[in-house]
Amino acid sequence: MSILLYFIALLSLIIIKKIKDSNRNLPPSPLKLPVIGNLYQLRGLFHKCLHDLSKKHGPVLLLRLGFLDMVVISSTEAAEEALKVHDLECCTRPITNVTSKLWRDGQDIGLAPYGESLRELRKLSFLKFFSTTKVRSFRYIREEENDLMVKKLKEAALKKSSVDLSQTLFGLVGSIIFRSAFGQRFDEGNHVNAEKIEDLMFEVQKLGALSNSDLFPGGLGWFVDFVSGHNKKLHKVFVEVDTLLNHIIDDHLKNSIEEITHDRPDIIDSLLDMIRKQEQGDSFKLTIDNLKGIIQDIYLAGVDTSAITMIWAMAELVKNPRVMKKVQDEIRTCIGIKQNEKIEEDDVDKLQYLKLVVKETLRLHPAAPLLLPRETMSQIKIQGYNIPSKTILLVNVWSIGRDPKHWKNPEEFNPERFIDCPIDYKGNSFEMLPFGSGRRICPGIAFAIATVELGLLNLLYHFDWRLPEEDKDLDMEEAGDVTIIKKVPLKLVPVLHH
């Protein structure tokens, strides 16, 4: 009898809450279970689960994850309202257990709460690293690292052996960013090497964005994280990341300005110099934690997005021979035979179809399928629904880029769709948002595009590509969490063109 009364009381509470929610004009929501909310519906890849739920319940969707309210936006129109009309009201970030620990309570650019500190950090990072002038100044690094990659691929081509192009492209982008941002090669530091950094990136990815402590505040969430080993793992990864960052900064502190090599002064030298010259009365003071946060943002975000974009582009080209032939014909016709076979960044400007291939890849395979979460700072209205203050907003750009309302045959890889099409990836067109929009748009767009375009140009100019004989078809299955990579590494056989 008591159990029956308990369930009647519980059912009554659910009905009362549902009536209250309907009176508040909240977005539609799938059936929620007590305590866990909608967690039971989120199996598999997170962005695809949200895509499927949005198709069923609408492009503005309210989910309850434990005790956490989250609104998922999956349409162009809703995204424009959130990121343009209400940009200021929802441009802060939620603080989670993982981001609080790994990013030192938001001392970086990507995950910092909105305020003066964020504005100053974005201004500094743009001035010292992301401006058009700065990006151009790093072109020789991009060209040199691509030449090294081509040299290694030629050795594999002569042996007629396959290469792990996923690993190759992560290595390429990692080397470019490490030299550009930190002024040294992987092999120049005693404490820094490509394998160690790749392992750390993988560990950070595995931790995910949310923990049980975020979903179930109080003792329950903490206890589950403690028993599962999540807290211990989080602390271990933080110590490893922090130790690596300390080594990178110490390497710069040991070198005086007179000893700086041709790759320097880099962003770390510049920011360390600013820290030394700060005065007591300055309204904003740059800290070592800010410096560490900027380093993490540049490397972790920069390597993932650029490498993943090139991997998906090459996979789609191999899967679509018509597009592969068209882009290679353009490249080889426009560039011709190069002296010493060295590609220069100026060559990219001639290649309009290559640029369309990059656009189409960013539409179909945004490296981060969900924009970093925002949090509302006041109540706003999206598509007629009330979104309360302190609600997490997730924009599903993977879903938006495949919306049949705005894209004909959205699952098809067709770069021609962008001919005479004003839609771009710079945050002004809400039909595709691979880098976000508004005050929290990714500051590294110019650097990423320069890296991707030159990398693809080198791969497509010097080599033809085919699947290894043992592979009959290309597996395009996705994997990942914050960023989405091919589940099966991209292994191809390079064939020398000349």
From Swiss-Prot:
Instruction: Please name the Pfam families in this protein's record.
Output: p450
Q: List, in alphabetical order, the Gene Ontology terms for molecular function in this entry.
A: heme binding; iron ion binding; monooxygenase activity; oxidoreductase activity, acting on paired donors, with incorporation or reduction of molecular oxygen
Task: Give a yes or no for keyword Iron in this entry.
Answer: yes
Q: What does the sequence similarity comment in the record state about its family?
A: Belongs to the cytochrome P450 family.
Q: What span is annotated as the signal peptide, if there is one?
A: none
Listed name of the protein = Cytochrome P450 71B24
Which gene carries the instructions for this protein? CYP71B24
Cell compartments where the protein resides: Membrane
Q: Which cofactors, by name?
A: heme
Q: Which residues cross the membrane?
A: 1-21
Membrane topology term reads: Single-pass membrane protein
